[in-house]
Amino acid sequence: MPLSYQHFRKLLLLDDEAGPLEEELPRLADEGLNRRVAEDLNLGNLNVSIPWTHKVGNFTGLYSSTVPVFNPEWQTPSFPHIHLQEDIINRCQQYVGPLTVNEKRRLKLIMPARFYPNLTKYLPLDKGIKPYYPEHAVNHYFKTRHYLHTLWKAGILYKRETTRSASFCGSPYSWEQELQHGRLVFQTSTRHGDESFCSQSSGILSRSPVGPCVRSQLKQSRLGLQPQQGSMARGKSGRSGSIRARVHPTTRRSFGVEPSGSGHIDNSASSTSSCLHQSAVRKTAYSHLSTSKRQSSSGHAVEFHNIPPSSARSQSEGPIFSCWWLQFRNSKPCSDYCLTHIVNLLEDWGPCTEHGEHNIRIPRTPARVTGGVFLVDKNPHNTTESRLVVDFSQFSRGSTHVSWPKFAVPNLQSLTNLLSSNLSWLSLDVSAAFYHIPLHPAAMPHLLVGSSGLPRYVARLSSTSRNINHQHGAMQDLHDSCSRNLYVSLLLLYKTFGRKLHLYSHPIILGFRKIPMGVGLSPFLLAQFTSAICSVVRRAFPHCLAFSYMDDVVLGAKSVQHLESLFTSITNFLLSLGIHLNPNKTKRWGYSLNFMGYVIGSWGTLPQEHIVLKLKQCFRKLPVNSPIDWKVCQRIVGLLGFAAPFTQCGYPALMPLYACIQSKQAFTFSPTYKAFLCKQYLNLYPVARQRSGLCQVFADATPTGWGLAIGHRRMRGTFVAPLPIHTAELLAACFARSRSGAKLIGTDNSVVLSRKYTSFPWLLGCAANWILRGTSFVYVPSALNPADDPSRGRLGLYRPLLLLPFRPTTGRTSLYAVSPSVPSHLPDRVHFASPLHVAWRPP
């Protein structure tokens, strides 16, 4: 007859009416009993012939393609101008005095952050925006492109201008200026002995040697170039040759645009209209950038007719411009859904490309991307805004993967010891935390995102892609991309983006200037950054407890009034460092803090309400007697593992599940095992903080007997049959706890000390976890252990009782997690048998 849940509870000694522990508990270590129970609960039978279940409630396999939903109404979030102060170390020192070595080292790591992968694979531009939403391809394309544009405008991305130069917006850092040797750059054109271009520099090249030099001339340069000098470039056509001050020869743009006659560049050609054509279609530019040898000695200058800003129409008469979008203006509509109708909606479609405020030299960067991007909901609670997902997973894969640095994640007990108190709490929201940390420009060639432009993107989605002649955008192929779907999508998007549609239909390549989220290095750097800042804050405000995990920063103080005044000063301090806080999202928690998925109060720690709800849903949906795919089990174990420390039996209760995942077999829940887990997770007990104290209870064991020293009393007993030493030591610890009720026990066994009972016989592990819940262990060397003699059967000999002090740990080094964090600890071995046959490795 199968084991009922009631019997199983009794067996695990979870009920009060169990017999004496010294008799009952050693039985649970018996191999035969463990095997029989495993068979009864159907835990050992891993090979099943019935088809596996691949979905349980919301849990699907780990690699399942749960299709995210596209929202045509997505708003692109706005990004503040984030500029972390470069002299952050000095500013902190002015505030708190000299920094510790640790704080300095962490802050130097991120000023600037560096990224050197072993190998970078370059992907074609078509892969830049992932076709994640085939139904909404065009809409997704423009929304993503707009998101990238927003990031570039906010100074988070560099825009690749040529193989060796990039432009960006926002305040430059010193390492971005060094790349220009701080020299003034003139570049003159020798094409027709005509006018020269000037691009003036303020330590960085303000723009590349093409085009919109007009705006830059009106800026006061740090080198003191006055606007009048800037115009020396006009009118002195005698100056051929280039006056260049040690600038790398390829900072010139090689655009394949043939000038149709030369003329002055008039100041009236305002910066917009001078951008108007100089883009010379990125498409044609890119098609030969990657292959082009250096062009004429001073690069192709792009020359214009003398165009007043308003005359955007004259550009349709110039026969040369091969801009895909503007070409529709000259062509006859091919149907009612021809793009010509849309292009004729506006006179002035604005520039083909935009340029950043600053220009910079970069290592050789091909016209390719290294990762794809797509949009998803910002978070499950906010579906109105989008979030950009960047997939740089190439750096975590294959034999050339980068081994990301590990960093300390506070474990549950340390967190409770540190934060469980009667303080008042609030949490700060750092807006766009990752985008605070600057990346060295040398990393740009490895972290490229972008898009191939609308025509290529559309062509790739339709079957006609073969006909499009990308090189020349030849007329007869222009209308190949016209279709009803595209027309309707563009008309709707025109309402949102207006003339930006033109800009966004061009190809673009962007590199990260701040750390992106899709690289394993980023969580590490962010953790270093926030923990260093919190460390500084704790020293500056000794009566404030500041703590952080990634971008989650919490402040605690004795009273609400005190907390509010601290909040003001700390906010001002963080703002002075250039850290952007989102004041609307500051949460005041009162005395129970919500942090890292836990609720932490003076009583201890429990999982947050939404996790408790998830647990209930999970058990409601869990099928009985049908094999569940092990990948789905991984998901289930992820959730149950998070809450395991709050249950009676803890992790050991999940061991059968771990075993099936390890052997990659399906798992079948028997009614009893499901009922057992369900009851375990219905009543959650808080994890309490450890108190420091003196240890006065000691336990020790040999394979044949156990001994206890409780104050001045000594006790001993023998086992019916010899047991593996770790099992014996665990039993002795359980006896010590049940006899003395002490929360502090001295032991000389490292496995018991680690409080990981997953490698013991299954039933014993579950029972011991409940008996020893809330117990702290102190290590005592065997030679000094007062329980050593009784365990060997000698009660007469007394060793002096040690007074061993116990200090709870708050060390952040208690658990090293590989970044980004991995699923909860999977043990090396899972045994229903005893650990006797297993060479034990320390945890």
From Swiss-Prot:
GO biological process: DNA replication; symbiont-mediated suppression of host innate immune response
Annotated ranges, domain Reverse transcriptase: 357-600
InterPro entries: DNA/RNA_pol_sf, DNApol_viral_C, DNApol_viral_N, HBV_DPOL, Rev_trsase/Diguanyl_cyclase, RT_dom, Viral_Replic_Matur_Polypro
Listed Gene3D superfamilies: 3.30.70.270
Catalytic reactions on record: DNA(n) + a 2'-deoxyribonucleoside 5'-triphosphate = DNA(n+1) + diphosphate; Endonucleolytic cleavage to 5'-phosphomonoester
Activity: how regulated: Activated by host HSP70 and HSP40 in vitro to be able to bind the epsilon loop of the pgRNA. Because deletion of the RNase H region renders the protein partly chaperone-independent, the chaperones may be needed indirectly to relieve occlusion of the RNA-binding site by this domain. Inhibited by several reverse-transcriptase inhibitors: Lamivudine, Adefovir and Entecavir.
Annotated segments matching region Polymerase/reverse transcriptase domain (RT): 347-690
Positions of the record's site feature: Priming of reverse-transcription by covalently linking the first nucleotide of the (-)DNA: 63
Ligand binding (Mg(2+)): 429, 551-552
Region (Disordered): 220-273, 289-316
GO molecular function (one): RNA-directed DNA polymerase activity
Alphabetized UniProt keyword annotations: DNA replication, DNA-binding, DNA-directed DNA polymerase, Endonuclease, Host-virus interaction, Hydrolase, Inhibition of host innate immune response by virus, Inhibition of host RLR pathway by virus, Magnesium, Metal-binding, Multifunctional enzyme, Nuclease, Nucleotidyltransferase, RNA-directed DNA polymerase, Transferase, Viral immunoevasion
Function as written in the Swiss-Prot or TrEMBL entry: Multifunctional enzyme that converts the viral RNA genome into dsDNA in viral cytoplasmic capsids. This enzyme displays a DNA polymerase activity that can copy either DNA or RNA templates, and a ribonuclease H (RNase H) activity that cleaves the RNA strand of RNA-DNA heteroduplexes in a partially processive 3'- to 5'-endonucleasic mode. Neo-synthesized pregenomic RNA (pgRNA) are encapsidated together with the P protein, and reverse-transcribed inside the nucleocapsid.
Family statement: Belongs to the hepadnaviridae P protein family.
Protein name: Protein P
Biological source species: Hepatitis B virus genotype C subtype ad (isolate Japan/S-179/1988)
Protein encoded by which gene: P
